[in-house]
Regions:
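Acidic-and-aromatic substrate-binding clefts and catalytic sites of carbohydrate-active enzymes
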Residues: 65-69
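Active-site mouth loops of central-metabolism enzymes
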Residues: 29-42, 64, 88-97
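Alpha/beta enzyme core
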Residues: 20-24, 38-60, 72-82, 94-118
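N-terminal amphipathic alpha-helix/helix-capping segment at the start of soluble metabolic enzymes
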Residues: 2-36, 74
């Protein structure tokens, strides 16, 4: 990121935790900020921004994500699965059937990875 933008974000994000843990079903989230993984220039920038945001819940577009990018990297190489609860999203789906199928695939992937978002 340019000109120390991440550092400014970190400074703004590091405030005293004044809200109780958010409970949604069996999930407990310290942050109310849910951040997506799309639209970043690189995986390194994404990881830096996620860290700076203080989020503990990250969405991943299952249908749009490539297995490997041109550099041979996978998005999962840059996400700390122990730190973040991953939520598969259905961006890019054009029908309800497609969205349900992609959501189920996402759940299976997270279950196989041992991520609590499954």
């Amino acid at each position: 990121m340019q000109n120390g933008m991440a550092e400014r974000i970190v400074d703004n994000a590091r405030t005293e935790q004044s809200q109780p843990v958010l409970k949604v079903g069996s999930f407990e989230l310290a942050s109310r900020l849910v951040v997506g993984t799309g639209k970043y220039a690189s995986y390194a920038e994404m990881a830096e921004c996620l860290d700076a945001s203080g989020t503990d819940c990250v969405t991943v577009a299952v249908r749009r994500e490539r297995l490997l990018n041109t550099a041979g990297e996978n998005i999962l190489d840059h996400l700390d699965l122990a730190r973040y609860t991953l939520l598969p999203n259905t961006a890019g789906c054009f029908s309800a059937d497609d969205a349900v199928r992609v959501a189920r695939l996402g759940r299976e992937l997270l279950r196989d990875l041992g991520n609590k978002g499954s």
